[in-house]
C-alpha cells in the first residue's frame, strides 16, 4: 500500500504540472495572438498594405518576433520539465514495484489444458460485459468452439441492462414476467421493484398521468402479501400529485440511487437464474491476485534471503495465510486441530459420534483396533461411526 501511495504522490505532481502548463500555454498564446493582431491592425491603418515600413515600425516588428521566440522557448523549456517529472513517475514505479513476478507463478498454468480453461474464462467474461465481437475474435484465435446457446443468455441480459441504465424498464419487465415462477422460487423481489419504479416514473408526470398510474397500480395485486407497506406508500403518494411528489413527504421515492440498485438486483437475480456467479470468475481471480501478489512477492524474497526455499514447494498450499477480505469468502475451511492441517477432498473433515470434528487422516492414525477414543472427551466409539461433513 505504501508503494501505491508513493507512486500516486509522484503522479499527482505530474498532473498538477500538466494543469499549470496548460493554463500558462493558453494564456501566453492568447496574449501573443492579441499582440500580433493589434500590431497588424495598427500597421494597416497607418501605412496601408503596400507602403514601406518606417524604421520605427521595423524595430517594433523585430521586438514582436523576439517576443514570439522568447514565448516559444519558455513553453518548450517548461515542456521539458514536465518530461523529467513523467520520467520520475516511471522510476518510482520501477523502484516500488517488482517487474518480474514469475518467481511466484506456477509453471503448470501455461500448459495446454490450463491455457484452454483460461481462454474459456476470458470468453465468458467478455460475454458478460457485452463485448461479443472481442469474445468471438478470441475464440477464433485460440481455437475455442463456443455453443451459441452459451452466448444467447448474455446477449439478452446485456440488452436489458443497457436499457435499465437509460431508465427504460419495459425489456426488464417483460423478462421478469416471463421468468416469474423461477424468480418466486428463489424468493426474488425483482418484478415488484420493476413495477414500483415504473409506477414512480408515472408519478413524475404529475396529474397528467394520474389515471394511467391508478390503472397501472393493478400490477401490484400479486405482491400485496409480501409488499403491503411499500404498496401503501406508493398509493399514498397519489394524494400529492397536484403539488408534485418532489414537494411532498414522498420525495424519497425519486431517489436516483434506486436505478443503480435495480441494475444490481437484476444482475444478481438473472445470474442466479442461469446458475452463474454475480461477478465473472476472471474479475474475481484478478482482484484476488492484486491483493495476494504483494504478500507473495514479499514472502518469496524472505524465503530466498534466509535460504529456506524448501518451505514453499509451489504446490496447492502457501507458506502463509493471505487475507483476501470477506468479499472473496465463498466456502468455509476446516483445519484439523490434531494434525494442524487444512482438510482437502482427499482428507475431508469427519464428525465423531460425540460431535467433535477431526480430519480423516487423524481418524486413521488414532484408532486402535476397533475402538477410537475422542481426543477431546472420554467417549469411546467405533471409527466406522464417524461421518464426513460438508461445509
UniProtKB/Swiss-Prot annotation:
It catalyses: S-ubiquitinyl-[E2 ubiquitin-conjugating enzyme]-L-cysteine + [acceptor protein]-L-lysine = [E2 ubiquitin-conjugating enzyme]-L-cysteine + N(6)-ubiquitinyl-[acceptor protein]-L-lysine. Keywords: Acetylation, Cytoplasm, Metal-binding, Nucleus, Transferase, Ubl conjugation pathway, Zinc, Zinc-finger. Its EC number is 2.3.2.27. A zinc finger (RING-Gid-type) spans 336-377. GO terms for molecular function: ubiquitin protein ligase activity; ubiquitin-protein transferase activity; zinc ion binding. The modification N-acetylmethionine is found at residue 1. InterPro entries: CRA_dom, CTLH/CRA, CTLH_C, Fyv10_fam, LisH, RMD5A_dRING, ZF_RING_GID, Znf-RING_euk. Residues 114-146 form the LisH domain. Residues 153-210 form the CTLH domain. It is found in: Nucleus, Nucleoplasm; Cytoplasm. It comes from the Eukaryota. GO terms for biological process: proteasome-mediated ubiquitin-dependent protein catabolic process; protein polyubiquitination. GO terms for cellular component: cytoplasm; cytosol; GID complex; nucleoplasm; nucleus; ubiquitin ligase complex. Its main location: nucleus. Pfam families: CTLH, zf-RING_UBOX. Identified in the CTLH complex that contains GID4, RANBP9 and/or RANBP10, MKLN1, MAEA, RMND5A (or alternatively its paralog RMND5B), GID8, ARMC8, WDR26 and YPEL5. Within this complex, MAEA, RMND5A (or alternatively its paralog RMND5B), GID8, WDR26, and RANBP9 and/or RANBP10 form the catalytic core, while GID4, MKLN1, ARMC8 and YPEL5 have ancillary roles. Core component of the CTLH E3 ubiquitin-protein ligase complex that selectively accepts ubiquitin from UBE2H and mediates ubiquitination and subsequent proteasomal degradation of the transcription factor HBP1. MAEA and RMND5A are both required for catalytic activity of the CTLH E3 ubiquitin-protein ligase complex. Catalytic activity of the complex is required for normal cell proliferation. The CTLH E3 ubiquitin-protein ligase complex is not required for the degradation of enzymes involved in gluconeogenesis, such as FBP1. This is E3 ubiquitin-protein transferase RMND5A. It comes from Homo sapiens (Human). The lineage of its organism: Eukaryota, Metazoa, Chordata, Craniata, Vertebrata.
Amino acid at each position: 500500500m505504501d508503494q501505491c501511495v508513493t507512486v500516486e504522490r509522484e503522479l499527482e505532481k505530474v498532473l498538477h504540472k500538466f494543469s499549470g502548463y496548460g493554463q500558462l500555454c493558453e494564456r501566453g498564446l492568447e496574449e501573443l495572438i492579441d499582440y500580433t493582431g493589434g500590431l497588424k491592425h495598427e500597421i494597416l491603418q497607418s501605412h496601408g498594405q503596400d507602403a514601406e515600413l518606417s524604421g520605427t515600425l521595423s524595430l517594433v516588428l523585430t521586438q514582436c518576433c523576439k517576443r514570439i521566440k522568447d514565448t516559444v522557448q519558455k513553453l518548450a523549456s517548461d515542456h521539458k520539465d514536465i518530461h523529467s517529472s513523467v520520467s520520475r513517475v516511471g522510476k518510482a514505479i520501477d523502484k516500488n514495484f517488482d517487474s518480474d513476478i514469475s518467481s511466484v507463478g506456477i509453471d503448470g498454468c501455461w500448459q495446454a489444458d490450463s491455457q484452454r480453461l483460461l481462454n474459456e474464462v476470458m470468453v465468458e467474461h467478455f460475454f458478460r460485459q457485452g463485448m461479443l465481437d472481442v469474445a468471438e475474435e478470441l475464440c477464433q484465435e485460440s481455437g475455442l468452439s463456443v455453443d451459441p446457446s452459451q452466448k444467447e443468455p448474455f446477449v439478452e441480459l446485456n440488452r436489458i441492462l443497457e436499457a435499465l441504465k437509460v431508465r427504460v424498464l419495459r425489456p426488464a419487465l417483460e423478462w421478469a414476467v416471463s421468468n416469474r415462477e423461477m424468480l418466486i422460487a428463489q424468493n426474488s423481489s425483482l418484478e415488484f421493484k420493476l413495477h414500483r419504479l415504473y409506477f414512480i416514473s408515472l408519478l413524475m408526470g404529475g396529474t397528467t398521468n394520474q389515471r394511467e398510474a391508478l390503472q397501472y397500480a393493478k400490477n401490484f395485486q400479486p405482491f400485496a402479501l409480501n409488499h403491503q407497506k411499500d404498496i401503501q406508500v406508493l398509493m399514498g403518494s397519489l394524494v400529492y400529485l397536484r403539488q408534485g411528489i418532489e414537494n411532498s413527504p414522498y420525495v424519497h421515492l425519486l431517489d436516483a440511487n434506486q436505478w443503480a440498485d435495480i441494475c444490481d438486483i437484476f444482475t444478481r437475480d438473472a445470474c442466479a437464474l442461469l446458475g452463474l456467479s454475480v461477478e465473472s470468475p476472471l474479475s474475481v481471480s484478478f482482484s484476488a491476485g492484486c491483493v495476494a501478489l504483494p504478500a507473495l512477492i514479499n514472502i518469496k524474497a524472505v524465503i530466498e534471503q534466509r535460504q529456506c526455499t524448501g518451505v514453499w514447494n509451489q504446490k496447492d498450499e502457501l507458506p502463509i495465510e493471505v487475507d483476501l477480505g470477506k468479499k472473496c469468502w465463498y466456502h468455509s475451511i476446516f483445519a484439523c486441530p490434531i494434525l494442524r492441517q487444512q482438510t482437502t477432498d482427499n482428507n475431508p473433515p469427519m464428525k465423531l459420534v460425540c460431535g467433535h470434528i477431526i480430519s480423516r487422516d487423524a481418524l486413521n492414525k488414532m484408532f486402535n483396533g476397533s475402538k477410537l477414543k475422542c481426543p477431546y472427551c472420554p467417549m469411546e466409539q467405533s471409527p466406522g461411526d464417524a461421518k464426513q461433513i460438508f461445509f
